[in-house]
Amino acid sequence: MVHEMDKTRLTTIAVVSMCDIHDPYIKIPDVVSYNHYFGWYGGDVSMNGPWFDKFHAEFPDIPIGVSEYGCEALNWHTSNPVQGDYTEEYQAYYHEEMIKQLFTRPYIWATHVWNMFDFGADARAEGGEDGQNHKGLVTFDRKYKKDSFYAYKAWLSEEAFVHICGKRYTDRAEEITRVTVYSNQPEVELFVNGKSIGKQKSPEHFFYFSVPNTGESVLTAVAGECRDESRIRKVDKFDEKYRLKEKGAVLNWFDITEKEGFYSLNDKMSDIMKSQKGKTLILGLLSGAGGPMGSKDSFINQENMASMMEMMGGFTLIRLLKLMGAANMSMTKEEMLDLNAKLNEIKKTE
């Protein structure tokens, strides 16, 4: 119909991850884009590039792009970012990886970050601040550019700059802390209290320094004529003000009992399912989510099983349970702890 009305107009479609690449409607528009959240809602961030390689290898004549990708970040911080923690550090890591995977594949016709700014979303209750989607590279009030904003600036802007990440993460407990710097200049030198700790070159525009963390330190990054400054301070233990504590959460990840060498709710789905006992436990759990396993009402059915299992592999089980809760398939705290106790009896598979 579109081509009948205007032969010069190209058509496109945005496709969600669960849609099989062999679905017939993929071939209807002139160009195609997928909404992929590998690394946030499912899977691992490393899955993105290979997925597009697979699509392009099978359909080299179909222009493929990314219509949505992103992850959420608020003013939470950590030195050990993980998927689903809502920290500025994980968002920065996620976008570093997405930039390296997407911007180096010339066959991808377009990429669309979701989103430039945090925005209102009345029904959402994530990350500790209700009513907003926090996938923006800039805060809702437009006053603070998150570190991930500067990752894109390093790749896309011709304006010379250097940026030290983690400015809102001052108090750190580790003896050696990692300091990340973004710049579109070829070389960055980092100074700690006026003393150089080294120079680095990076064609990827991301620079990582290991910094001794003692007392109070002034960090200065120099790239050509550009300078940026930040501060860190050594503390005895992790400051809980940096950690998200979900309001009304049935169970938080740090409340879960872990046994060395055994599984827990904090392990990834893909790791748990390496064990036959773990796989049986997980499939039994999912079989009761929404309807009988394989039925159209089930969380996983015959139509989406392969794609859903691929997506969920990067989830910790506690994160999956929270997403199921958001879809009105919640478990009580007692049920979660009982499930964790069962996992604590299953040895990890090498």
What are these regions (language model features)?
Residues D44, K145-D147, V235-D239, T332-E335:
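Alpha-helix initiation/capping motif
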